[in-house]
């Protein structure tokens, strides 16, 4: 067999011409240590703060520490099979999560992946988990209410759209119950809800999702979950992911409500990450930037003006204000509100609802302490009728608490003091409310009107609950148009006052409670 040199050279030329060289430049490094979800990488010279790092097995880590000759990163997801010597590379991207209306009614994890078994998400794109909060000029003052459906909250500690109102209290005082009822009450208000569960048991979250579904509120809600069994990195990032999903609605001229349950567990997860990254510990072993951890999150809850919305949507949405209202939850230890994280969040937010163990155990639920609970901006957002009728409630309770303390030592009390004590007891009883039973503005207004105008004076303390139930059943049956008018307008004038007085007079005559 004879070899033809010409043919061979032609064949080689063809093969060389067909050879496709695609060069890809990437910044590659090597894992030098793995410990509790934190990896140290050598060789990523151009890595940026907060950049996603691609790991073997289609996983990612986020770069948090940029040091002279190494990078400290937290792994998002399982890390047991990661080992020294493995190759990793920079992606040039920061963490993004899916956003859009298709997420409503779904349960997702921190990275936006569905975990409810209902198939893939129908999303409108991706949004960065870290975003700069709107500036002062882009904001609008808070002047529209968010009704929680709780008499004690909507009357004394009103919440406005775009406000940050802290729910604070010891464990088992009804913090989550208050937040879940606030979500249930938004079924027909048009406010979209995001519930972020951080460091909770999967069984607890499953129960919350079931309750939302039972009460028809899940279709209006996105549930973001980072359970206690998940890595500290996912628990730390969950609130930012939920906030990005809420900002989608805010920036398009809609209203959204986000609940962080709870930020104490997020701070603990961040402390764990920081200590593993060898950052210097400060008070209570928290890192120095734990204030910034919460402030950069909560400042993103805001009411933005129409110009901001128009600029963001490139003119598609005009004349609409958007808002993101935040209800962060903080768990205290033995009622200590002066601990590090509680004081930080109190100073960041626009008020707090303080839930007390003693009140809860005494059967006063919601266990709101009106003495140290406050809403700094919500008063401007209250409806006219609620503002008018709720003024005397806080005063009556404050006087009652003061007199109750003195009456323990005094044996003979004058009639005026006895009346005040009796009125205070009845108002306290009236503000009690069952879980999953939010009340409309009209129902609350009627009940507050009865307390304000002395209609409870001759009702026995033990009958206050049945008096309220019978009164609400009576108006729903015979005076539904007036209730609808109050719910729609929230107005208060002499005519409405006269009608409310007439309803209560005719109801008292029936003695049906």
Curated annotation (Swiss-Prot):
InterPro entries: ATP_synth_asu-like_sf, ATP_synth_asu_C, ATP_synth_asu_C_sf, ATP_synth_F1_a_nt-bd_dom, ATP_synth_F1_asu, ATPase_a/bsu_AS, ATPase_F1/V1/A1_a/bsu_N, ATPase_F1/V1/A1_a/bsu_N_sf
Species for this entry: Shigella boydii serotype 18 (strain CDC 3083-94 / BS512)
Subunit structure as annotated in this protein's UniProt entry: F-type ATPases have 2 components, CF(1) - the catalytic core - and CF(0) - the membrane proton channel. CF(1) has five subunits: alpha(3), beta(3), gamma(1), delta(1), epsilon(1). CF(0) has three main subunits: a(1), b(2) and c(9-12). The alpha and beta chains form an alternating ring which encloses part of the gamma chain. CF(1) is attached to CF(0) by a central stalk formed by the gamma and epsilon chains, while a peripheral stalk is formed by the delta and b chains.
Subcellular location: Cell inner membrane
Gene Ontology terms for molecular function: ADP binding; ATP binding; proton-transporting ATP synthase activity, rotational mechanism
Record-given protein name: ATP synthase subunit alpha
EC number(s) recorded for this UniProt protein: 7.1.2.2
Name of the coding gene: atpA
GO annotations of cellular component type: plasma membrane; proton-transporting ATP synthase complex
Range of residues in the leader sequence: none
UniProt site (Required for activity): 373
CDD domains assigned to the protein according to its UniProt record, in alphabetical order: ATP-synt_F1_alpha_C, ATP-synt_F1_alpha_N, F1-ATPase_alpha_CD
Lineage of source species: Bacteria, Pseudomonadati, Pseudomonadota, Gammaproteobacteria, Enterobacterales
NCBIfam families assigned to the protein according to its UniProt record, in alphabetical order: atpA, PRK13343.1
Main subcellular localisation: membrane
Binding site for ATP: 169-176
